[in-house]
Amino acid sequence: MPNKNMTNKLKYILYQFLTGTVGNFLVFLQPKKARRLAENRITLVHKNKKNLSVSERLMRAALVKKLDKIDDYNQIAELNRGFWINNATELFVETEDGFETDFLPNCTFIFDLLKDELGDQRAAFSTLVEIGTGNGDVLNYLSSEFPEVNRFVGIDLSPKQIELNKSKFNDNKKLEFVAADAFDWVTEHGHSNTIFVTSRGVLEYFLEERLQDFFKEIYRLGKSVFIAIEPNGGGHNFETSPHSQLYGNEPSFSHNYPRLFKNAGFTIWHFSQKPWLGGYDKQTFVGAKSF
């Protein structure tokens, strides 16, 4: 009987054959559909497989393999920023089940840890800011988990998504949604006694230097807590490679979050990692505080 490693290897070989041979053949036979699937690089990489037929999944995998390699960090940052301003809504629709299938079962534990970490100081925090709020589901959830917080602000680059969120959560008067660059908003409106949150892929689009400056700006506000739930490349070892690396097919940046928080003056009170959605990459959980 084949062992588990052999079985996984055979599955990998079969997958490579299907995507490399069958997928490419389907792309050749259906060029219009291929162009539609590949209209946007980031959407192609993240497209929800549940909404695709088997043939479309094979075509998608083959198309992802053909993506041009990008090494220019500034170009990557600009391309990703442009996407999140202009095209993000379609991706949020594609991945809208992620709140139920990923966030609730895999990520909420860190907010239970936050409650324990704050203890009697919970009432001192008057504002919670979610950077990269997306469809607003996480912010809405947090408003019920932290009833002592009076104000919940969701910031996103996409004006269209922000308008959708305002309509969707009109009945929750604690929620505010703002279309803005997070760095600019924090510089102008940030204050002490604030909890900052990112969830499952926001800070990965910052250049390392800008992210470091962003953490320093938040630290200067005064008393604050930061919960970062961010992906990292599966092969990124923070000890041997302390600086940011490219990862994935978008691509985006795998940052050494503990290092960047510490450099800004924060104390790390929680750090853990787990496989992200069962894949090679990792989901990193960081709890940092400025006091």
Where are these regions (language model features)?
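Class I (Rossmann-like) S-adenosyl-L-methionine-dependent methyltransferase catalytic domain
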Residues: P2-H189, E209-D213, E217, V225-F291
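Mobile active-site "lid"/loop adjacent to the S-adenosyl-L-methionine
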Residues: G222
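Hydrophobic adenine-recognition pocket in adenosine-nucleotide-binding enzymes
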Residues: V202
